[in-house]
Swiss-Prot record:
Gene: rpoC2
Organism classification: Eukaryota, Viridiplantae, Streptophyta, Embryophyta, Tracheophyta
Name of the protein in its database record: DNA-directed RNA polymerase subunit beta''
Role noted for this protein: DNA-dependent RNA polymerase catalyzes the transcription of DNA into RNA using the four ribonucleoside triphosphates as substrates.
Cofactor note (record): Binds 1 Zn(2+) ion per subunit.
Record text on subunit structure and interactions: In plastids the minimal PEP RNA polymerase catalytic core is composed of four subunits: alpha, beta, beta', and beta''. When a (nuclear-encoded) sigma factor is associated with the core the holoenzyme is formed, which can initiate transcription.
Reactions catalysed: RNA(n) + a ribonucleoside 5'-triphosphate = RNA(n+1) + diphosphate
GO cellular component, as recorded: chloroplast; DNA-directed RNA polymerase complex; mitochondrion
Protein family: Belongs to the RNA polymerase beta' chain family. RpoC2 subfamily.
Keywords from the UniProt entry: Chloroplast, DNA-directed RNA polymerase, Metal-binding, Nucleotidyltransferase, Plastid, Transcription, Transferase, Zinc
SUPFAM superfamilies reported in the protein's UniProt record: beta and beta-prime subunits of DNA dependent RNA-polymerase
GO biological process, one term: DNA-templated transcription
Cofactor: Zn(2+)
Stored InterPro entries: DNA-dir_RpoC2_beta_pp, RNA_pol_beta''_euk, RNA_pol_Rpb1_3_sf, RNA_pol_Rpb1_4, RNA_pol_Rpb1_5, Rpb1_funnel_sf
């Protein structure tokens, strides 16, 4: 050793890492004994210094970091800006939550990093600083909570609480912060109590599965190895992990650099050799691992490698299995206590940022990136490959390479300042975070009407569902307004866009309950002559409008019940008529029979020509039983058009309707039962039964008669025909006919008797066999049909004597065809005839086909009595003037189906032009998709606000443009980012489109003849998609009203720069909050333009919600939503708290081979298909051999990596060898399959992989098997020792099975010998145990051979014992002779 005078004094702090390195180098240079002597001296010195220093901890030693104040203030400011962005609709709730978490997490981490330099500069001998950073007591996380800030906390489930604790424990917590802190404290206490036992049980199972693994040979002779490379296909392995993987291993192959061998096979790898190999840049190194060892129940020295205790090859007889189990289980036991100390503080991760080194201009290739949104909602560019970004300043050009899948946060040619963030890198972070997919539901803050842009899929995700998917980022708008049901709007004749008084709207109800009347007041007649003849004075009784709607997917069906002796008092005018109802709001729970009139109104309130307006099911034409329908005459079948069909509201659907031209029809009843195919029928075909006869076990007949059984697909149809059976003579004429109706008066002539019939009968010929037949005479029910009702008497004479052009016609429909069977399902009745009112009108102009009939519900109050009416009015449609959105101006006219409805059209708009007063509201009509009720939306003055009057509007017949010169606005920035709202930061002019005429408001600015007249001189016209139209300045131009924004370019524009721009306010346009639409007048609220007047705009309040692709929108377009209704569902990944208590269950899941995620069916099919293919290509033995081998190798590597990931995330280092020994045991069994049947093993039997291979080689017969993962519990219960299994779990079952099978335990493991009190075959008892076992094998083998056993059992035993004997003898000869 060098002289003391020549020693160099190092003035450095030695922490735990430095001491580890020191000890390692001391052992390398001086050996174990001398190192322990030196370390004893260090220990003594440490105790002396600690005693002299006498460190104590006081409250004054907790020094708060001075920069904390402004750091927290800065985080609060960022949170406030984030809240505003969310309010404006720029970010959605999930992005806001993510950004909020990262803001506070970054603040907390920065404070933690500041803590050490602060202590080092201000008070380096501070006891808190010395303790926490020496590693002796406490850690940085605990001290950070004492002097920094506690930050974000986890709840007991590991979920993050998004309210941060800004105080530290030195300053003291507020009440809210204290309650949140209690979550963490409780979590720590619970984890310490509960999870410690879990970790202990895991250790026990791990030790159980590998207790018999002992090093028993030096070399197993394997030629296999596992290749380790620092560069993987997917990611780079860090150098530290690479070195840890290699140190202590043994090489499987020689390593050559060029032609020179630098390391040879079976050489163990030390730190020096590993560093040399890394320096040489070796691509891949093949090493031996426990996976490659050829032994079944033990391991060799070279496959295990160096012993972790003394750094040399492991000794023979060492129980490496127990060491492996303890090494994996022990950190789990220790780490559960860590939660208690840190108190459940959330630990997450932030992205790495690339910052600009100095001021300059950014340059990059725009073709290699595409625009996207970051997870915080910021606009960014995503690059798929390595992107070179150049920063140019005056004298320096600096290049930065951005890795793939990173976000670029700056634009090309943008000027950046020094330290500005230019990119965000999310790849390459190796910290492991537990993530889970979470659903986040966004609820509506206010009541109103839902609108969205064209970016939302209007077709629902599934049929009849209300979930819509988003293909791209879009805004959802909730337009404000209070809703009321139709029966609750008081004292108003409410039509769309009418105005009404608001004080009466005090009642709001979310759903309208069904109203009803008493059953005994229901009339059985529909439109009888009583309606026309009686002229009563006073107020007649009317039926009520029922809120129950039909289940039809197309129409509303309102059941309206007319009372007895009541007039159908209807007002009639040219082009319209009113039908009254009476609202009776008592007896809400009465059942409404279907005998009333049902008025059917289409979902859009529009009737087409010849559409059915109402229908009535007469109870006289209703049957409870099944049967066959026959017409009196057969010439009548005129089928009504498909669009006039009515879908029945009951259980069954009707066939096509037939218009009756006959005076009677006949119904032949029969009893029908449809039974499952497997039913046990207790009657025979063509037998005769009486009433109440048992047909099946739980079914009895209602009538008596002839049984007919027909077997059809998957069902049995059993019919009972009632009637008389006759066996006719040859002279009977009736016997030649079958299926005919005989009227009364015509009797059956017979030699013995003759009588006349009183009723119609139906004659049917029955032929049970070819030679025998008889005639069944069945009774018939006859129905007469009354004449059609004349509707001229329905309406009283009109004083004005106007020509009627709306007609109502009455049609009777038979709902079943001639000879068609009717089937009643369970107890439902069958309606045979339906009476319908059909609406029609005369066309005034033969060339015009735009007339249509609209239905409105009207409620009128007269002297305190409230009456409901349906108002049917003929109006002209304005739809044909509306063009489709995004069409070019010359695309022609389209139909109303393609319009994007903003507001319903009303023919009278005079009232709507008035300004909104405080006590007035505007009515909006709605028809809900759920068909519960018709709803109305009331817009009051509180829902709208006015902008204006504007002073800068000039009236000319040419469009006046207020021009703001700004050459830096590019065209692509002018339209809104979502296509629905414009970006108005640089628009300072408000420009309504005006001509000489006054403007009436329908859906847009309506000029004369419903056309838009523009005179654009020397200008181009640009639509919002950026297309340029060069317009003829001398022609009138018809523009699309659904183009939300038109921009005017002067002719001398250049480089796509917009020199002159103007704002056009369109009706129905959406504006976000805080943008300018007029000069110096910011827009204070978000909303939709409702009224455009000469100098001002009325805007309806609206709340925007942002939704990104993958979100699900609940509800339909223009549906009324209530406060608290679910609006959007986001599905996103969320980090969980990354402590060991979340990690241990994952380790257990992997080791017990439980399914973590459900595998899709497609993947399973593909795997099965691959197995079949490889078997077919390679043949049965090779296919199974290679398939099982590949599966086992890949699954082993994957399992090791998964377990290591959990422990490394906690900073725990476990050598791969320990995990490999465990994983080898749970993957070492294979399942014998049924494909190639062998004489050795049974299908479904679990055998060792090596045993299956050796048996196959010995027998020269293919054994078909497939790989199986057992799990540590199942592997412990599938060993060669039943004593070991019984001492682990299920003792009685294991011992009973072992006794029945006659199993023999060879006491090869440690546990069996411990249980029986023998010497364990490890360590010093290694030799004795093995020799003893060998002798035992031989004796038993000889005894067995002496006995006469069956041939099969003898063969089995011979093979197995030969193998064992050979192995043991070779061990004892080769290895033990040297010891």
């Amino acid at each position: 050793m060098a002289e003391r005078a020549n020693l160099v004094f190092h003035n450095k702090v030695i922490d735990g890492t430095a001491i580890k390195r020191l000890i390692s180098r001391l052992i390398d240079h001086f050996g174990m004994a001398y190192t322990s002597h030196i370390l004893d001296q260090v220990k003594t010195l440490g105790f002396q210094q600690a005693t002299a220093t006498s460190i104590s901890l006081g409250i004054d030693d907790l020094l708060t970091i001075p920069s904390k104040g402004w750091l927290v203030q800065d985080a609060e400011q960022q949170s406030l800006i984030l809240e505003k962005h969310h309010h404006y609709g720029n970010v959605h709730a999930v992005e806001k939550l993510r950004q909020s978490i990262e803001i506070w997490y970054a603040t907390s981490e920065y404070l933690r990093q500041e803590m050490n330099p602060n202590f080092r500069m201000t008070d380096p001998l501070n006891p808190v600083h010395m303790m926490s950073f020496s590693g002796a007591r406490g850690n940085a996380s605990q001290v950070h909570q004492l002097v920094g800030m506690r930050g974000l906390m986890s709840d007991p489930q590991g979920q993050m609480i998004d309210l941060p604790i800004q105080s530290n424990l030195r300053e003291g917590l507020s009440l809210t912060e204290y309650i949140i802190s209690c979550y963490g404290a409780r979590k720590g206490v619970v984890d310490t109590a509960v999870r410690t036992s879990d970790a202990g049980y895991l250790t026990r199972r791990l030790v159980e599965v590998v207790q018999h693994i002992v090093v028993r040979r030096t070399d197993c002779g394997t030629i296999r190895g596992i290749s380790v490379s620092p560069r993987n296909k997917n990611r780079m392995m860090s150098e530290r992990i690479f070195i840890q993987t290699l140190i202590g291993r043994v090489l499987a192959d020689d390593i050559y650099i060029g032609s020179r061998c630098v390391a040879f096979r079976n050489q163990d790898l030390g730190i020096g050799l590993v560093n040399r190999l890394i320096t040489f840049g070796t691509q891949s190194i093949s090493i031996r691992t426990p996976f490659t060892c050829r032994s079944t129940s033990w391991i060799c020295r070279l496959c295990y490698g160096r012993s972790p205790t003394h750094g040399d090859l492991v000794e023979l007889g060492e129980a490496v299995g127990i060491i492996a189990g303890q090494s994996i289980g022990e950190p789990g036991t220790q780490l559960t206590l860590r939660t208690f100390h840190t108190g459940g503080v959330f630990t997450g991760g932030t992205a790495e940022h690339v910052r600009a080194p100095y001021n300059g201009k950014i340059k990059f290739n725009e073709d290699l990136v595409h625009p996207t949104r970051t997870r915080h909602g910021h606009p960014a560019f995503l690059c798929y490959i390595d992107l070179s970004v150049i920063i140019e300043s005056e004298d320096i050009i600096h290049s930065v390479t951005i890795p793939p899948k990173s976000f670029l946060l700056v634009q090309n040619d943008q000027y950046v300042e020094s330290e500005q963030v230019i990119a965000e890198i999310r790849e390459g972070t190796h910290t492991f975070h537990f993530k889970e997919r979470v659903r986040k539901y966004i609820y509506s803050d206010s009541e109103g009407e839902m609108h969205w842009s064209t970016d939302v899929s209007h077709a629902p995700e599934f049929t009849y569902s209300n979930v819509h998917l988003l293909p791209k980022t879009s805004h959802l708008w909730i337009l404000s307004g209070g809703s009321c049901g139709s029966s609750l709007i008081l004292f108003s004749i409410h039509k769309d866009q009418d105005q009404m008084n608001i004080p009466f709207l005090s009642v709001e109800r979310k759903s309208i309950s069904s109203l009803s009347v008493n059953n005994d007041q229901v009339s059985q007649n529909f439109l009888s002559s009583d309606f026309a003849d009686k002229k009563k004075s006073g107020i007649p009784h009317y039926s009520e409008l029922n809120g129950n709607l039909g289940t039809s997917h197309y129409n509303f069906i309102y059941s309206a019940i007319f009372h007895e002796n009541s007039d159908l008092l209807a007002k009639r005018r040219r082009n319209r008529f009113l039908i009254p109802f009476q609202s009776i709001q008592e007896q809400e729970k009465e059942f409404i029979p279907h005998s009333g009139i049902s008025i059917e109104i289409p979902i859009n309130g529009i009737f087409r020509r010849n559409s059915i307006f109402a229908f009535f099911d007469d109870p006289r034409y209703r049957r409870k039983s099944s049967g066959i329908l026959k017409y009196g005459t057969l010439k009548a079948d005129s089928i009504i058009q498909k669009e006039d069909m009515i879908e029945y509201r009951g259980v069954q659907k009707f066939k096509t309707k037939y218009e009756m031209k006959v005076d009677r029809f006949f119904f032949i009843p029969e009893e029908v039962h449809i039974l499952p195919e497997s039913s046990a029928i207790m009657v025979q075909n063509y037998s005769i039964i009486g009433v109440d006869t048992r047909i099946t076990l739980n079914l009895r007949s209602r009538v008596g008669g002839l049984i007919r059984v027909e077997r059809k697909k998957k069902r049995i149809e059993l019919k009972i025909f009632s009637g008389d059976i006759h066996f006719p003579d040859k002279t009977d004429k009736i016997s030649r006919h079958s299926g005919i109706l005989i009227p009364p008066g015509r009797g059956k002539t017979n030699s013995k008797e003759s009588k006349k019939l009183k009723n119609w009968i139906y004659v049917q010929r029955i032929t049970p066999t070819k030679k025998k037949f008889f005639v069944l005479v069945r009774p018939v029910a006859t129905y007469e049909i009354a004449d059609s009702i004349n509707l001229a008497t329905l309406f009283p004479q009109d004083l004005f004597q106007e020509k009627d052009n709306i007609q109502l016609r009455v049609f009777n429909y038979i709902l079943y065809g001639n000879g068609k069977p009717t089937r009643g399902i369970s107890d439902t009745s069958i309606q045979l005839v339906r009476t319908c009112l059909v609406l029609n009108w005369d066309q005034e102009n033969k060339n015009s086909s735009v007339e249509e009939v609209r239905a409105f519900f009207v409620e009128v109050s007269t002297k305190g009595l409230i009456r409901d009416f349906i108002r049917i009015g003929l109006v002209k449609s304005h739809m044909s003037y509306i063009r489709k959105r995004n069409n070019t101006p010359d695309s022609g006219l389209i139909s109303a189906d393609n319009m994007n409805p903003v507001y319903s059209i009303s023919p009278k708009v005079g009232i709507f032009q008035q300004s909104l007063r405080q006590n007035h509201g505007t009515i909006r009509m709605f028809l809900n998709r759920n068909k519960e009720s018709q709803s109305l939306l009331i817009l009051s003055a509180s829902n709208c606000f006015r902008i204006g009057p504007f002073n800068h509007v000039k009236y000319h017949n040419v469009i006046n443009q207020s021009i703001k010169k700004n050459p830096l606005i590019t065209i692509k920035n002018s339209p809104g980012p979502l296509g629905t709202s414009i970006q108005i930061s640089n628009f300072f002019s408000f420009l309504p489109l005006l001509t000489y005429n006054l403007i009436s408001v329908i859906k847009y600015l309506q000029l004369d003849n419903l056309k838009y007249i523009f005179q654009v001189i020397n200008s181009y016209l640009i639509d919002e998609n950026g297309r340029i139209f060069n317009l003829d300045p001398y022609n009138n131009v018809v523009l699309n009203p659904f183009k939300l924004n038109w921009y005017f370019l002067h002719k001398n524009y250049h480089h796509n720069y917009c020199e002159e721009t103007s704002t056009i306010i369109s009706l129905g346009q959406f504006f976000c909050e805080n943008v300018c639409i007029a000069k110096n007048e910011p827009h204070l609220k978000s909303g939709q333009v409702l009224i455009v007047q000469r100098d001002s705009v009325v805007i309806r309040s609206a709340k925007p919600y942002l939704a990104t692709p993958g979100a699900k929108v609940h509800g339909h377009y223009r549906e009324i939503l209530y406060e608290g209704d679910t609006l959007v569902t986001f599905i996103y990944e969320k980090s969980r708290s990354g402590d060991i208590t979340q990690g241990l269950p994952k380790v257990e899941q992997v080791l017990e081979v439980r399914a973590i995620d459900s595998i899709s069916l497609n993947l399973e099919k593909r795997i099965k298909g691959w197995n079949k293919c490889i078997t077919r290509i390679l043949g049965i033995p090779w296919g199974f051999l290679i398939g099982a081998e590949l599966t086992i190798v890949q699954s082993r590597i994957s399992l090791v990596n998964k377990i290591q990931k959990v422990y490394r995330s906690q900073g725990v280092q476990i050598h791969n060898r320990h995990i490999e020994i465990i994983v080898r045991q749970i993957t070492s069994k294979v399942l014998v399959s049924e494909e190639g049947m062998s004489n050795v093993f049974l299908p479904g039997e679990l055998i060792g992989l090596l045993r299956a291979e050796r048996t196959g080689r010995a027998l020269e017969e293919a054994i078909c098997y497939r790989a199986v993962l057992l799990g540590i519990t199942r592997a412990s219960l599938n060993t060669q020792s039943f004593i070991s299994e019984a001492s682990f779990q299920e003792t009685s079952r294991v011992l009973a099975k072992a006794a029945l099978r006659g199993r023999i335990d060879w006491l090869k493991g440690l546990k069996e010998n411990v249980v029986l009190g023998g010497v364990i075959p490890a360590g010093t008892g290694f030799n004795k145990g093995l020799v003893h076992c060998s002798r035992q094998y031989t004796n038993i083998l000889l005894e067995k051979k002496k006995k006469n056993l069956s041939l099969f059992e003898g063969d089995m035993r011979d093979i197995l014992f030969y193998h064992r004997e050979f192995c043991d003898s070779s061990i004892s000869k080769s290895d033990f002779s040297r010891i």
